[in-house]
């Protein structure tokens, strides 16, 4: 039976206005829209009155529901029948954890009530198309129609393909029907294999073969034999990449054989809880570094949010599934798309060349895709710290004559670093009889054929197959699985994981054969033991679907009870679906139909399939000299600053959490004005050291339209000039990931790919001492479609994205582009040696040209000398600022440095040649460094010692004020106010934020950037930052116990425990499942802290599901009430813990006036480094800090204080319960965005009880308790940041 329960309003006023504006633009007479959530409860038994009231209360969250009955025509948008949304699985979990076992499943839809004039059927179709994502949702016209969401179907049997009866044609037909993308020789191979076996193949076997042997999984082109211009080539592409490892194996611990590569890290204190006692402590050991970079291009073109989200999720799983289990740590992301054509902000170079119907626009991708990638990282709890963004779409005269080149098939890059224990780097041995386990969520009928689909050019496959190949994301489930993996590796020698892989392309059909085959075993499996939420799925759908957030593991049979215990505690679902066999054979039994859908020798599936030979021709690009007529420097500056590749990226940065883990030493945002211009990302290796890890990206794809090899060399060079800004030491410490994107088969591109791989793998990297131990290829970067009567193609440039990773010696010595105005000198190190080439530059692009000669690595020895020289200067502390030259050239390098320093520049380019345009806009490799004027001679001496004397040019100095002036030989070349340039640079991000978020907030942020008087972040402390008020109490030897409380989806508990640990507490890991099962109680604890993250993925309101699992469970409710009423206890709730505790008002004495915390005014997750003031309040944690103003990490989507009315707000204020407020950079309490990131009235962001014993706050003090983890800080701070004081206050209060 199904119950229907109304929910809260689903759209804010500005979202409704945006929808109405879209309808009006489409000439649809829609006058009014009202939208509200509707909940559907599938029940296995009727609810009594109390249970019904409980369910209603559970589903009451968010803004208050309108009292009137909605008017207009109903359009009900729900998940597609046959799928289960992530919302559903998490909401159902909450219901069960609250004791409502009669609920089979909860699901949610949005009921739109449309008031409109007379619309035709076709116009109604237009309306419904605007309201739902056809990839994931459907539209009903009556609430009762939602019954279809819970319809169950009977299982369907396996289907046989009549090869023996119909011969080869049966395989050809199956290839088309199932979208297998099999090549002719593979069809021959299968015909031969099954004829020898004397039986017909089943559809599931063919599908499994296609996935396991797709280009996506087997990398056939990179392993192919090559004939170029009739000449046999000596090496495959992959062998040339491996040459870098053979030449420089130094510091690499694992390459080419696992889900990620591993290099040596530093010996540090890894901080985690003991399995038996739950007590957190440091464990001194090597924290080796793993690295991986993936792409998820095809799904992102079809459906950007889930495409980018599952791209990030899959890469995170790769990291976790390295060795015998590892810990993902920090991420990077990148996008290449065609021109944005922002409505009302179209640029002169942005022509519309059309696109296929089934893929979305570049604007859609950049609106939804980054949000999907960021949301996954945020909810999983991984900071996203680095990235790139390129737009390109043009008709150019390249290698193949005049043709369309651009990114209709986008690049969506997802990568990152993690850490792994030394004894877990290599996978273990799978013994015969080992249990084969799937860890993670259930099988769902989604993401079928992703491997094969992504191996085809967009437009070649059936639209329905395209849709089927997109997956859904549930990061909170992946977090639970990762917690299990963490518990396993933390057991050291007792780790129950023998072998682990992630489930990605091809689902279990690829992952399980890979697992057993890599372990030298076969496997026998039972289909019906696979967790599945859809009983009507066929064997093919169960075995081959790409449901996300799953891992496959081999666990020793005697370790299964331990593994079961860990999974139950973390509430991570798992299933034992088979066991390892001696015989190298794969069998899958189906007990429902009592048959064998799969019965194959492993070597048929993974054996010697036909090897590819690429017989290709070289084409040379002609190029045309840059036509300069009509180009002025003033116009060029404005155009280049508007090019998205160059322009400010704030709209891509602040949506991503950049502080979670408490180990982020350098994020994108630089300096007191928080400008997104960092050269590289840096994390600390642990919470107790200054060792670290660095990441940087290099990418120069448009250059490949003129010179394939130069483009690849520049990508390596740019990655190197970016990562050089931190203290690494020997260049051999740097390891690269190479991600290759090409349109294989397009004239000239294959030979160009070979040329580029050779340039990097055989020549440049070995010469520099660089290794490429990991990478990925995507070989179908072309889109075909019909535009009227014309057949069109959009082919991407050959695109190499290099991600550089390195161990860092001391994270405190990372140099940023932030200029200082003390007596200084700016020096350009020009590795272009005066070539100043303008081919394929940003300048050429904004004037719709390609040019002829591009930049290149001009001298490999000088590039190596450059890196070594910068490292020497970093170590000697000679650099005040550093920024590499890249897209936009020297002009943009200097401008970005001025933006970061909020200062002026007097630049002198006299020594850079007479061609001023080329001097300012060439994109040759190099960097601008700022040094003290007194150090100039010593710095130039170091550069000369490294062979760079002829590359160094004096280019002026930074000055106070707002003028950005470039001169040469006393003549003014360009002059403008820095503020004007800053506003131009910001206009793209402003327009994107206006489209995507609350336009009022976007306008306020843009306005703030034009205020030259803004003093930036600053600090005023009312206490001595270096005084340890806890020291006398720590000296007694007593360590009070603090319960570090987490619920599924919480992700900030480790850094919280570390902060309390440093203040003299014993921090104990307490999961809500420990309390609900009675494994742990709160009676032994002196303090309790509820941590940040996304409990239940913020389903049923942020923190509300967590609170209700306490309130609706009598024993646990009593436990909390007793704790809060016990004298001499302290409690802190941060972010998600703050939201949760605000819903426990009925249990917490003196909290009756506390507000609720609801959706930010911007309607967006906000990650900021915000200034707050400590106000006079009873809070015991903030004693002695009143009046202090200091920055703090903020990361939340629902942090806006909501009060009942003005009287409620006045009472909260008059009782003095407000503990922290947002202030602007002038020190004034503010409600203006982004200084107040959520729009809370009176800037309120923390409140306390009347006794001061319980304090809740939205910002994250635990992420910035170390100075080094602050995005910006005064130079005189030591190890401890000012927020360490609240943890020491807690220790002091407990005596």
From Swiss-Prot:
<feature type="active site" description="Nucleophile">
    <location>
        <position position="1135"/>
    </location>
</feature>
<comment type="pathway">
    <text>Purine metabolism; IMP biosynthesis via de novo pathway; 5-amino-1-(5-phospho-D-ribosyl)imidazole from N(2)-formyl-N(1)-(5-phospho-D-ribosyl)glycinamide: step 1/2.</text>
</comment>
<dbReference type="Pfam" id="PF02769">
    <property type="entry name" value="AIRS_C"/>
</dbReference>
<dbReference type="GO" id="GO:0005524">
    <property type="term" value="F:ATP binding"/>
</dbReference>
<keyword id="KW-0067">ATP-binding</keyword>
<protein>
    <recommendedName>
        <fullName>Phosphoribosylformylglycinamidine synthase</fullName>
        <ecNumber>6.3.5.3</ecNumber>
    </recommendedName>
</protein>
<feature type="domain" description="Glutamine amidotransferase type-1">
    <location>
        <begin position="1042"/>
        <end position="1295"/>
    </location>
</feature>
<dbReference type="InterPro" id="IPR036676">
    <property type="entry name" value="PurM-like_C_sf"/>
</dbReference>
<feature type="active site">
    <location>
        <position position="1260"/>
    </location>
</feature>
<dbReference type="Pfam" id="PF18076">
    <property type="entry name" value="FGAR-AT_N"/>
</dbReference>
<keyword id="KW-0547">Nucleotide-binding</keyword>
<dbReference type="InterPro" id="IPR040707">
    <property type="entry name" value="FGAR-AT_N"/>
</dbReference>
<dbReference type="Pfam" id="PF22689">
    <property type="entry name" value="FGAR-AT_PurM_N-like"/>
</dbReference>
<keyword id="KW-0315">Glutamine amidotransferase</keyword>
<keyword id="KW-0479">Metal-binding</keyword>
<comment type="subunit">
    <text>Monomer.</text>
</comment>
<feature type="binding site">
    <location>
        <position position="722"/>
    </location>
    <ligand>
        <name>Mg(2+)</name>
    </ligand>
</feature>
<dbReference type="InterPro" id="IPR055181">
    <property type="entry name" value="FGAR-AT_PurM_N-like"/>
</dbReference>
<dbReference type="GO" id="GO:0006189">
    <property type="term" value="P:'de novo' IMP biosynthetic process"/>
</dbReference>
<dbReference type="GO" id="GO:0005737">
    <property type="term" value="C:cytoplasm"/>
</dbReference>
<dbReference type="InterPro" id="IPR010918">
    <property type="entry name" value="PurM-like_C_dom"/>
</dbReference>
<keyword id="KW-0963">Cytoplasm</keyword>
<dbReference type="Pfam" id="PF18072">
    <property type="entry name" value="FGAR-AT_linker"/>
</dbReference>
<dbReference type="InterPro" id="IPR041609">
    <property type="entry name" value="PurL_linker"/>
</dbReference>
<feature type="binding site">
    <location>
        <position position="884"/>
    </location>
    <ligand>
        <name>Mg(2+)</name>
    </ligand>
</feature>
<feature type="binding site">
    <location>
        <position position="886"/>
    </location>
    <ligand>
        <name>ATP</name>
    </ligand>
</feature>
<feature type="binding site">
    <location>
        <position position="678"/>
    </location>
    <ligand>
        <name>ATP</name>
    </ligand>
</feature>
<dbReference type="InterPro" id="IPR010073">
    <property type="entry name" value="PurL_large"/>
</dbReference>
<comment type="function">
    <text>Phosphoribosylformylglycinamidine synthase involved in the purines biosynthetic pathway. Catalyzes the ATP-dependent conversion of formylglycinamide ribonucleotide (FGAR) and glutamine to yield formylglycinamidine ribonucleotide (FGAM) and glutamate.</text>
</comment>
<keyword id="KW-0436">Ligase</keyword>
<comment type="similarity">
    <text>In the N-terminal section; belongs to the FGAMS family.</text>
</comment>
<dbReference type="InterPro" id="IPR036921">
    <property type="entry name" value="PurM-like_N_sf"/>
</dbReference>
<keyword id="KW-0460">Magnesium</keyword>
<dbReference type="GO" id="GO:0046872">
    <property type="term" value="F:metal ion binding"/>
</dbReference>
<dbReference type="InterPro" id="IPR029062">
    <property type="entry name" value="Class_I_gatase-like"/>
</dbReference>
<dbReference type="InterPro" id="IPR036604">
    <property type="entry name" value="PurS-like_sf"/>
</dbReference>
<feature type="binding site">
    <location>
        <position position="718"/>
    </location>
    <ligand>
        <name>Mg(2+)</name>
    </ligand>
</feature>
<dbReference type="Pfam" id="PF13507">
    <property type="entry name" value="GATase_5"/>
</dbReference>
<keyword id="KW-0658">Purine biosynthesis</keyword>
<dbReference type="GO" id="GO:0004642">
    <property type="term" value="F:phosphoribosylformylglycinamidine synthase activity"/>
</dbReference>
<feature type="binding site">
    <location>
        <begin position="307"/>
        <end position="318"/>
    </location>
    <ligand>
        <name>ATP</name>
    </ligand>
</feature>
<feature type="active site">
    <location>
        <position position="1262"/>
    </location>
</feature>
